[in-house]
Amino acid sequence: MLKVAVVGASGYTGVELLRILHCHPEVAVTCITSEQSAGKPVSDLFPSLRGRYAQVLENLEPIRVAEKADIIFTALPHKAAMEVVPTFLKLGKRVIDLSADYRFNDAATYEQWYEPHMNPHLLPKAVYGLPEVRRAAVKGAKLVANPGCYPTSVILGLQPLLKHKLIETAGIISDSASGVSGAGRGAKVDNLYCEVNEGFKAYGVGGVHRHTPEMEQELSLLADERITITFTPHLAPMDRGILSTIYGRLLTPATTAELAGLYAEFYGGEPFVRVLPAGGVPSTAHVRGSNFCDIGVVVDQRTGRVIVVSAIDNLVKGASGQAVQNMNIMCGLPEGLGLEGLALVP
């Protein structure tokens, strides 16, 4: 039985980790921390966990946490993870970090978009934890940088096209809509019910969203050349989910059926990627609460563009579910263990 700690359990990714790990047959959650709510029962913070987690939330004391766990999930804000991850690694623990602190290959890029990096020497040692791209590297990793939610949806949507060199690498566009939980659990005026309900808006327009360089780094590695992407995120009036609509110009003519077949073959062995039949497009409703990424691909013959639509649950495949998927791979467990749940319908 794996002993697991969840560090920073007061947010949505933290509670989602607890929800998923409760159903994992090879895991015992032995430590749960929250600086804001230390001393309170977990169920006080999240009544949905009542009767399933009897623990009291603890202060974050890295040595004490490490004594209790084999695997540590850090669900902390950016920068906060950097303050504790080195200690966990020195103590021989394996870490899956859900912040952006270790997603970049170089400190300069991180610092351009976030802030000064406290331990840049760890960046080359971290594995970007998108299993469908880096499964072999994740298997032997000590530190996994769990991908962002938007990048997960976009990278999975584009991977077959880039690997097969089917589209121009210039001019790729993604319009992506996320549920409000993607903004976190903290109180913000923009996320109040009356501000979000019955509305749909773009934000981070003009290439300023922090997930942009993360996408570009990974897409460039897939294409083996420098890629820039026009990425515009949107806030949708729903709790959870991401729908990315991605546009690329085909280098050679192809039909919808041909590309749907290519995608189906490319992802045929993947447990959590479902390719829709030719002409089908996914919905966030069909992945809600699950670890699936649903993908549809359509060719616009008039313009010579291919349109890829991908749907994920931002809190599951876009965060905590993917983190558990990475844990399974790191520990030599069946990849889908604890993640077999289907979408919540309706």
From Swiss-Prot:
Principal subcellular localization: cytoplasm
Organism name: Geobacter sulfurreducens (strain ATCC 51573 / DSM 12127 / PCA)
Family: Belongs to the NAGSA dehydrogenase family. Type 1 subfamily.
Enzyme class: oxidoreductase
Descriptive protein name: N-acetyl-gamma-glutamyl-phosphate reductase
Active site residues of this protein: C149
InterPro entries xrefs: AGPR_AS, AGPR_type-1, NAD(P)-bd_dom_sf, NAGSA_dehydrogenase, Semialdehyde_DH_NAD-bd
UniProt GO MF annotations: N-acetyl-gamma-glutamyl-phosphate reductase activity; NAD binding; NADP+ binding
Record EC number: 1.2.1.38
Pathway: Amino-acid biosynthesis; L-arginine biosynthesis; N(2)-acetyl-L-ornithine from L-glutamate: step 3/4
